[in-house]
């Protein structure tokens, strides 16, 4: 099937056999964002959201999501993660506030952690939305993308943010 490793000879889905791949340190970082009204930002900052500390809950949700990625992405291998770190950065604009979320994941294993990082960043953003939707159902999530990855036979990857007009997503 022309370069896609998740298909067998019959064109059906398969989980790739990684038993012959060497175990190396692998990392990945993914980002997402939540665009919201100033009012939502102020309530998050003052811990005035009825459901609790939004960023603390989102952080735990992101860590849990990284650990559970193989349960929701069918062809992902279950991995023993060495670490997951979530960071948040606010960008305050005139008409809106943007919460930038960065998920960094690390393992020593036979396959990469890109999907774990992407899942983690996505679930963080979804959790923020869930906890704040009573104030602003018009929040926008995204973009969500892989920022960088290291390790593995395909080598390292680092996204050039200027290519996609994403300089403020760092």
UniProtKB/Swiss-Prot annotation:
Pathway: Cofactor biosynthesis; molybdopterin biosynthesis. Keywords: Lyase, Molybdenum cofactor biosynthesis. This is Cyclic pyranopterin monophosphate synthase. Catalyzes the conversion of (8S)-3',8-cyclo-7,8-dihydroguanosine 5'-triphosphate to cyclic pyranopterin monophosphate (cPMP). One of its GO terms (biological process) is Mo-molybdopterin cofactor biosynthetic process. The active site is at 130. It catalyses: (8S)-3',8-cyclo-7,8-dihydroguanosine 5'-triphosphate = cyclic pyranopterin phosphate + diphosphate. Substrate binds at residues 75-77, 115-116. It comes from Bacillus subtilis (strain 168). InterPro entries: MoaC, MoaC_bact/euk, MoaC_sf, MoCo_biosynth_MoaA/MoaC, Mopterin_CF_biosynth-C_dom. HAMAP family: MoaC_B. Homohexamer; trimer of dimers. Its EC number is 4.6.1.17. GO terms for molecular function: cyclic pyranopterin monophosphate synthase activity.
